[in-house]
Amino acid sequence: MARIFQPKKKTQLNTRHQAVQVERLDHHGAGIAYLKKKPLFIDGALPGEEVVTQLVEEKSKFARGKLIKILKPSEARVEPFCSHYHECGGCDLQHLNYDQQLTHKQQTLRQLMRKFAGSDIELGAPVLGESLGYRRRARVSLFVDKKTRQLHFGFRKKQSKQIAQVTDCPVLAPELNVLLPEIYSTLKAFKKPEQLGHVELVLGDNAPCITLRHLNKLTEKETNTLVELAKRHQASLYLMPETDQLDLVEGEVPFYQEAGVTVPFTPNNFIQVNQAVNQKMVAQAVDWLDPKSDERVLDLFCGLGNFSLPIAKRAKHVVGVEGVAEMVEKAVNNASLNQINNARFYHANLEQDFEGQVWAAEQFDKVLLDPARAGASGIIDQVSVLGARRIVYVSCNPATLARDSQSLLEQGYQLTKLGMLDMFPHTSHLESMALFEKS
């Protein structure tokens, strides 16, 4: 007999306002209260606060609420310094004083390592830079309202594809922030602003850099207007008519310097957002790795050579491996530019088994890993076959660091140092660094 499908009746969401006590923050900076013994996540709420919330989502194991009113504020609560904070999705912790932000991030890192890697270790001092004006790159979103023909210019709203109108960003480097209102006024005068994609801003040591992604060819007048804007600010200007095409039409190729090396890049290359923290991060990684003049070092996920090139100044030989072919080519060029002759670079897929790769047949004294947020799960189980006695793991996701750490511990390594790097102040995002050693 055929069964007749009957859709499950949806439970009516109770949207009435409810007062709750916030107990702690989750790893993403949301306040956690409990409603009927179920965790209730409330963005913008802080531990110790009594707040009024309205349910916006309810699942079998958790619920989410919207912050309506704060009945009893936390002593750690501060007034956000940005007028766009409650709308823009760029920052999510401006309402928490900076010292408490650091404490929260350190606790998050330690808790994740304890829970998933089974390792409880005291953290070293956090690596810090300036908490404002620190971003040396940002992508500005563009959208034209079909009805009003108004150009929206700014950053994505919180948990939305809509754009918050922003022409002033306190966490953006001043050299880039000053460009925002002028770029906006220039672009909104274009004949067909709906044919514009986005604006990429990046600050090199030599100059700020503006990149405009556009779908149709710009008029000569529009191009000249952008060139004049760039000249006024002594900026480089790239036009990007295709996803993989970059045309430098004004200024010079940007570069940054660190640890005695010069690293040229283009706007579509990955570089760390926070220059000051990046410099300290590289210095700490080299210090923890402690490469000797007779040692061979492997740098996995090497990018442009952010770590490889400074390490090569001290090691006998460095091998860098990267999954993006263009980055490998530029790493080779960067080594040549800096007259570094003891570094080789390879293109390889580091999301899968590296057995059979030429570089993997070699033995290394030390290894550095700097993977993307997904971590290094594709190769982490093989690291011990490389023979390294010391491994430095630089992570932009503490959850995947904790997961990969478990594998390294099972391979006989010991976690001897752990630290947090505040690459993104006023956000819940945290970077970390771990040192593993094998006797």
Curated annotation (Swiss-Prot):
The active site is at C396. It catalyses: uridine(1939) in 23S rRNA + S-adenosyl-L-methionine = 5-methyluridine(1939) in 23S rRNA + S-adenosyl-L-homocysteine + H(+). One of its GO terms (biological process) is rRNA base methylation. The keyword Iron applies. It is an enzyme of class 2 (transferase). One of its GO terms (molecular function) is RNA binding. It comes from the Bacteria. Gene3D superfamilies: 2.40.50.1070, Nucleic acid-binding proteins, Vaccinia Virus protein VP39. Keywords: 4Fe-4S, Iron, Iron-sulfur, Metal-binding, Methyltransferase, rRNA processing, S-adenosyl-L-methionine, Transferase. S-adenosyl-L-methionine binds at Q272, F301, N306, E322, N349, D370. [4Fe-4S] cluster binds at C82, C88, C91, C169. Its EC number is 2.1.1.190. Belongs to the class I-like SAM-binding methyltransferase superfamily. RNA M5U methyltransferase family. RlmD subfamily. Catalyzes the formation of 5-methyl-uridine at position 1939 (m5U1939) in 23S rRNA. This is 23S rRNA (uracil(1939)-C(5))-methyltransferase RlmD.
